[in-house]
Each structure stands twice: as structure tokens, then as C-alpha cells.
A protein has these predicted regions:
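SAM-dependent transferase fold signal centered on methyltransferase-like domains
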Residues: 1-410
Length: 410
């Protein structure tokens, strides 16, 4: 193992195809494993820095590093698990161990974690890696969770929480979005799981439809967490509670780059609140102040009227999910939840304004929403190249028609 570790560190930046072709130069090195470790380390750099920085860890499956949680989302999930356990010591069974990143983060909060994985080589690597990371409260088991095995798995682990991140790729790497298409199938297993423990924490594709997923899972969904970081929606987490009979809460979370030292921006609501919320699109003589573009988590949550209502914002249009405020204090409050722009000018979207704006701001970012052209078409009409002179928006206002807004990031 020491030779492999040294080889990986020495060749971390090398061309992997060349290493494979020249494998005969290093007869005492398992080149397939070495290449997989190098691939994985490249993916883990900046994603799970503590793992990348530990030279003793091995990674036999490159795809696992690509699919594993980041440090930020791993920390968030472990904190959520602790809240599910009401802050008390808890036991957790991870039925989809994979690379082991989630199990490792859970182990920092849990009394004991049981890692279950169907691929033997991942289990061998996980046991080695957990020891190298001094994670002494993780038990590794090489087993697949099926209706035939789940009772034995949970009888041994005796968990307070079961965690599942079902594999979302089918044959040929095809992405799967429906719950029943993923492995293991939580729809098949959930009733058996509930006979052994009260709580299930389920991670789904961030592309999954929340309403459909919760409907398929039955009335036991207690909370839905949409977790975004780095401008991308990364995870969709569903907390299921065997004893829950109420409406589920949706929490949209934006994790800042400084998380966990910096608090996340979170916005919680129930669907019934969004249904009765109203957003003002009242007529105005001008559009001025600040423009707010909700982050990916809020957009996924679909709480478009509640955003306007809770933050006291004017919504440009029923189907245009951009908001305006004249308050600097409000603009500062909104920053963690998305992007805020200072409005320099607003004018009708027509040939004259397009020509004048393109000439005045030749290097600008461009966004088109809810108007009869897409972003690329508007960019070509403006004749601008990408740059930071301004950010030009083509947006539809219910009261003023199609607008051309010239803004700068606030």
C-alpha cells in the first residue's frame, strides 16, 4: 500500500492514458487502482478537501468520487440528522455507502454508523479509509439492501435513522429520476424499514419533482430540504417520519462558500402558504432600485409569491420570477438568497434601446426571461461580448411590457 500511495502522489498530474499504456514500467503497481485513485483525488480536490489531503486513502471506483457528497453538503446532512434525533446520541444505518463520505460526516455527529455497500471493493476501501481517518465508530458491511436482506440488516444495526442515497444511473450510465427506477427502491423497502426505525433520510436527484416524489412516498414526508451551493442545486433531501401525518415543510437552503463558519440562508414554507400568498405587480412609473434573482434552491422550491410577500418585494410579472426593491437594507438582506443587481436604467425593449444599450455597454453579461427571444438571440441583437461592464436583462413586466434593464452586480 505504501508503494501505491507514493506512486499516486508522484504521478497525480500525469496523463492517465499514458500511465495505462506504460504500465509495464511499474510491474509492482496495480495500475488500474492507481489510475482510479488519481482520478478520484482530482475530483475530491476542493470537494472533500480532508480526504484529498490524506495520502493514505484509496479509491477503487472513480465514479464514486464524482457522485459523492461535497464537504458542505455532507456537513449539512450530518447536522440535519442530529436535529432529526433531537440532539440526542443516535445510531444511523447508511444503506448506500458508496465512497463513504456521507457515512464519515454522519459519524462526526452519531454514536455509531453502519455503512452498507454492495460492491466488495468499495467496502474494502471504505474500511481502510475510515481507519486512516480515525473514524472508529463506523461498522462496514458488504451487502445489498433488498426486501430479503433488509430485516437482517436493520436487526443488526438497530438504527434510529436510516439514510439512503439510491443509485440514479441505470444500464449504460443512463440517468434515472423516478424513485422506483433507482437502486435500492425505497418505495419497496420503506414499510419494512419503518418496522425497525422511525426515521428515514432520503437523498434524491436535485432534478426530481418534489410534489410527485412526496406523493409517491406517501403521507410520511415531514421535511424537504433543497440544498444549493456554488450556484447549483446539489441535493434534494426528504425526511420521512413514521409517525408524521401533517403537511410537509419545504426548506430552500443556500450554503455560502464559507459554510459552516458562515450560516446558510434558509427559507422554509408549506405548499399551502404559497397557494394563498400574493405578490404585488402594482403599476409603477419606473423600475428602479435593485433587481433580485432568486438562487437555485428558491427557484427549485417554487415559492415565487411567498418570496415577494415575506421580503416585501415587487414581482415584475406573474411568470417572470424577478423582483424589485428600492431599499438598500432589503438588498443586503437578499444577497445570501441569490443575486442582487443595482438597476442603472430601465426602458422599453425595442430596436432603439437595444442598439443604444449595445453601443454603451459593449462588454456585458446578458439574460433574457419571459420575452419573445432567448438569451443568445438578445446577446446577438445587442452585439455585446461577455464582460463585466454591466448585466443586461430582457424581462417581461406585467404592467410595463417587455423591458431592457441595465444593471450592475451589487
Amino acid at each position: 500500500m505504501e508503494k501505491l500511495t507514493a506512486f499516486v502522489q508522484e504521478h497525480i498530474g500525469d496523463d492517465l492514458t499514458r500511465l495505462i499504456l506504460d504500465r509495464k514500467k511499474w510491474p509492482d503497481i496495480d495500475m488500474d487502482l492507481a489510475v482510479s485513485c488519481i482520478q478520484s483525488r482530482r475530483k475530491l480536490k476542493g470537494k472533500v478537501q480532508e480526504w484529498f489531503s490524506n495520502p493514505d486513502l484509496i479509491f477503487p471506483v472513480g465514479l464514486s468520487a464524482e457522485q459523492c457528497s461535497s464537504s458542505a453538503t455532507g456537513i449539512y446532512k450530518s447536522g440535519l440528522a442530529l436535529r432529526i434525533a433531537d440532539g440526542r446520541p443516535f445510531r444511523l444505518a447508511d444503506l448506500t455507502g458508496g465512497l463513504g463520505v456521507d457515512s464519515w460526516y454522519f459519524s462526526k455527529k452519531a454514536k455509531q454508523v453502519w455503512y452498507h455497500e454492495m460492491q466488495e471493493k468499495l467496502c474494502i476501501a471504505a474500511e481502510h479509509n475510515f481507519q486512516s481517518l480515525n473514524a472508529e465508530n463506523i461498522v462496514v458491511r458488504n451487502i445489498i439492501s433488498t426486501p430479503e436482506t433488509i430485516d437482517g440488516i436493520l436487526s443488526e444495526a438497530r438504527p434510529d435513522i436510516v439514510y439512503m442515497d439510491p443509485a440514479r444511473r441505470g444500464e449504460g450510465g443512463k440517468k434515472m429520476f423516478l424513485i422506483e427506477e433507482c437502486t435500492p427502491d425505497v418505495l419497496t423497502l420503506k414499510e419494512q424499514i419503518f418496522r425497525h426505525c422511525r426515521y428515514i433520510l432520503l437523498k434524491l436527484s436535485p432534478m426530481a419533482d418534489i410534489t410527485m416524489a412526496c406523493s409517491r412516498l406517501g403521507g410520511k414526508c415531514r421535511e424537504v430540504h433543497i440544498v444549493a451551493t456554488g450556484g447549483e442545486c446539489k441535493e434534494l433531501l426528504i425526511w420521512m417520519d413514521r409517525e408524521w401525518a401533517g403537511e410537509y415543510t419545504i426548506t430552500a437552503v443556500e450554503l455560502p462558500s464559507g459554510y459552516p463558519d458562515m450560516d446558510p440562508a434558509s427559507f422554509s414554507f408549506c405548499s399551502s402558504e404559497e397557494k394563498i400568498a400574493t405578490a404585488s405587480t402594482r403599476p409603477r412609473n419606473d423600475v428602479s432600485g435593485f433587481l433580485f434573482e432568486p438562487g437555485k434552491a428558491l427557484m427549485k422550491a417554487g415559492c415565487f409569491n411567498l418570496i415577494a410577500e415575506r421580503f416585501d418585494l415587487m414581482k415584475l410579472g406573474v411568470s417572470t420570477h424577478y423582483y424589485v426593491t428600492e431599499s438598500t437594507a432589503k438588498a443586503d438582506e437578499l444577497k445570501p438568497y441569490g443575486k442582487v443587481y443595482m438597476i442603472l436604467s430601465a426602458q422599453p425593449l425595442d430596436k432603439r434601446s437595444i442598439k443604444a444599450t449595445g453601443a454603451a455597454y459593449p462588454r456585458a453579461e446578458v439574460t433574457a426571461r419571459n420575452i419573445p427571444m432567448d438569451t443568445e438571440t438578445l446577446r446577438k441583437k445587442l452585439g455585446v461580448t461577455s464582460g463585466d461592464d454591466a448585466h443586461i436583462f430582457g424581462l417581461k413586466s406585467d404592467t410595463r411590457g417587455n423591458l431592457l434593464l441595465i444593471t450592475r452586480r451589487y
